[in-house]
Amino acid sequence: MGSVNGYLATHAAIALVVGTVLAGLAELFFPRFVNRTVHRIRRGFILDPLVNLMKGETSLHIAVATTTHPAFHRLGSGDPITLPENAPFLPFGQAMGMADLRGAVNDRYGKKRSVEIDYADRFGLGWKHSFVALGGPYVHPIVKDVLDRGLVQGFAVEDGPVVKDEGERFHASRDGTTPESPLTTDIGVIIWMRNPYNESRKLCILFGLWPPGTFAAVDAFLNRSVADAKLQRKFRRLVRSGQDCVAIVETSISALTIGVPTIRKVRSFTYQHRPTSPAP
C-alpha cells in the first residue's frame, strides 16, 4: 500500500513540475497568446452582469411580484386551504427564475454571498441596495413606478399585453384565439439601469408578458443558454461600460416546456435624474 501511495505522490509531483515548466515556457515564447487568453478569462468574468450587480453587496436582493395564490382546494374536497403568507404559490416562470438566480449566486460565490427575497410591497430597505425586480408592471409596484415615471426612455408595456420599444411592438403568440389558448411564444424583458431610489446602486428588472417570458429573461440575463451570442455580447458590454440598457427576449413554449431564449433587440438609453420618492 505504501509503495502505491509513493508511486502516486511521485507522479503527482512530476505532473506539477512539468505543468509549471510548460506554463513558464508558454509565457516566455508565446506571451501574446498567454496574455490574450488570461485577458479573455478575466473579461468574461468582468462582463458577467451578475458580477456587476453584486459589486459592493453581500447579498443578492430580489423583490418579487405580489401575484400569488393565497389558497387552494384539496382534491376531492371543496374546502379551501389557506396558505401561509410566506409560502405562496407563485407563477411557475417566476419561481423557476428565482431558483436560477439563487443557483447562479451559489455557483459563483458559494457561501460568500447570500440571496434575500421578499415581496415588492414589503421590500423594506432592500431598495437601497443593488437589486433584482422580478415581475412586470401589472403586478410589481416597483416596476410600475419606474415605467410610470418614464425612466426608461422609449419603452412601455401596453394592453394586450404588448411591449413597445422605440416604436417596435413585441407580443406573445398563441395556439388559438380564446383567452385560455396556450402560448406558443412569449416575450421577456431585461432592463439594466441605475437604481432610481439610490443612484449609487443598480436595478435589474426581469419580467415577461407572461410567466414563461419571465423565466426567459432570467435565463438570458444569466447567459445560461442564448441563441444569439452577438446580441448577448452587446448587452454585456453595455453593462460593463456602465450604460443603462434594455434587452428584448423571445422564447418558444411547448406545453410547460420553455425553449432557448433568443435576444431580439438590445439598446442603451440615457438615464435622466428625476426627483425620487420612497420606493413603493
Outline where the language-model segments fall.
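Hydrophobic, helix-forming membrane-interacting segments
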Residues: 1-38
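Solvent-exposed alpha-helical segments and adjacent loops
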Residues: 33-280
